[in-house]
Amino acid sequence: LKGETEAIGKLFERTMMEKHGVQNLGEHYLVTDTICDATQERQDAIYKLVDEKPDIMMIVGGFNSSNTSHLQEISEDANITSFWVDTADRIDTENNKIAWRTSYGEMRETENWLPEGKLTIGITSGASTPDKVVEDVLEAIFMSKAETAAGSAL
């Protein structure tokens, strides 16, 4: 989709160059690099969140989402332990395992990802991630934490 948008922009630019000339292009054509409000709000919020140094960051969103990838990248760059999942199915609540993706696309699996005891978890999601997906991930985190606590009591 992004590639198609860029191709349309290039076609429009060439058309304006032919019609108005290269020297007059700036008067008739302007390129701006923008992101949607929802994406900008999430990026601003995660910068504030990582400044609070949570124990874990949970990034929720599609693996094909560039804005979600950037949220994971921000968290990684802040040296926060972070896990990017696209669905709650990536969290094995019974065995305290999580399958997750890095910002550069590598899939990983981590055992004992949710430590015992009190911790602070930051959570964010990509701009187009449905609320239901985020809710399911939160539920899986709570279930995992309950399993971890129950296991330590045995």
Name these PLM-found stretches.
Residues 1-112, 144, 148-150:
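Redox- and metal-dependent alpha/beta enzyme cores, enriched for Fe-S-associated oxidoreductases
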Residues 60-62, 123-128:
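Glycine-rich beta-strand-to-loop/alpha-helix junction loops that act as flexible
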Residues 56, 118-120:
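Residues that mark the start of a beta-strand
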Residues 31, 121-123:
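Extended hydrophobic secondary-structure segments that form protein cores and membrane-embedded regions
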Residues 70-71, 128-152:
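Extended, folded domain segments that form the structural surfaces/walls around functional sites
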Residues 113-117:
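Short, glycine-/small-residue-rich phosphate/pyrophosphate-handling segment
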